[in-house]
Each structure stands twice: as structure tokens, then as C-alpha cells.
């Protein structure tokens, strides 16, 4: 940067460190209110940084608003998005496409946990709030992730312009799992409480996972609507499709299938283990399964 080059606005000289090549490139950008920019950080476009923000290393912030204690470091890229609150974004994380990162502590029993997005995680067109954790090689698009929910490893959260994916409470999506929204009305996957989608499992469409649900292996759950609640385990090569309710200590494994056809709802209530090549296409009569 050549001395005398016009840049953005700052409220005091301490905003820009004297070491490194950090700079605010656009004259319509502004940094104030205790913000510190250091290292080789680049601030471009009409960005606004305020309220004890710290941006360092090789961060690139473009056309974004960063505020209220956000700490951005390493090689993070933030484009066209909002980040506010005490959070940590580091590694090679990418946040773009009008994402909103809104950190808030004190809403869960873990009062000290900070919202974090790091490693090579990618967040696009999504809202990540409270104390959520996105890391590893996770990809999150068109999602609403709140509370202490986590997405990590190589997991993929794929909503669309019609329907977002919703993760809340202490839900986890990990491994190579995929959670996908559909384009039909209400085709919104919702993962609550301590439920998990792991390994190579796929959850798609109007599916609600509530208390103590684990979907793993190569299982496919495609709604809907589908409701899984109270200690349900879906694993192996098992498959659930159509309008299905499964609750109260039920395990599907091997190549088991629960499938509802148009106009019907299948209701399976445990305790039960459904395995082998077993196939259920209507609600079992009490005592027969």
C-alpha cells in the first residue's frame, strides 16, 4: 500500500495496526468503536466494522457488517454477510450469500460457550445463531442453526430458496451425513434436542427428529411427513419413506423398510427391533410385530 492512498474511514489511528499490510480499501467502508484490524487483513466494499471487533492475519471482509465483539482470524473470508456478537471465526472458513451469524450466550446451560465457525467450514445463505458450532469440512446452505447445534466432519446441510433446514438444541450432523430440504410445501427437515444424523445417512424432506434419535450407517429417511421420537435408532441400509411415525424405543437395521403409500400413515410404536429384510407398509396390529 502506497503512503497517502485514500482508504475507508476510521475513528482513531489505533484501528489499523502499523505492522503488516492491513487496509480498508473502499472509501465507503468504516471501522470504529474499538475495532482493531491487523496482519494482512483486507476490508473491501461497503463494509462496516464496529464494537470491539478484532480482525487479523489474512482475513478478507467484503461488503459485510461485523460487530459487537466478533473475533475473525487466520484465512477467513466473509462476503456480503452479517456477523455480530462474541464469536470466533477462524481457519479457512467461508461465510457468504447474505448469511447472518448472530452470537448470544446465556440462552443454554453452557453459559460460556462461544459460537464458532472454523476449519474449512462453508456457510452460505444461512442463519447461525446463539452458540452453534460449524467446523471441519462441513457445508451449510440455506439453513437455520441455533442453540448448541453442531455440524462437522464432512456433513452437508442443503436447504434451498423455498425451504431451510432447521437444527436446534443440541442436535448434531456429522460424518458424511446429508440433510436436505425439498421444494414442496413444508419439506423442511427439523432436528431437535440431542438427535444425531451421522456416518453416511441421508435425511430429506418433511422429517422431524425429536428426542434421542440416531440415524446412521447408510440409512435413508425421506418424508413425509416423518416423525421420529423417543429413542429411535435407524442404521444399516434401512429406509423410511412416506408418512411415517416411529416412536418409543424402536430400532431399524439391516435392510428393513418402513414405507407409507399415498394417503396412508404408518405408525410404529416400540419397544421393537425391525431388521433383516423386513418390510412394513401399514400400521402393525398390537402384538403382531
Tell what function each PLM region has.
Residues 5-38, 42-44, 50:
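LRR N-terminal entry segment and analogous cap-like coil->beta motifs
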Residues 39-289:
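Glycine-rich hexapeptide-repeat left-handed beta-helix
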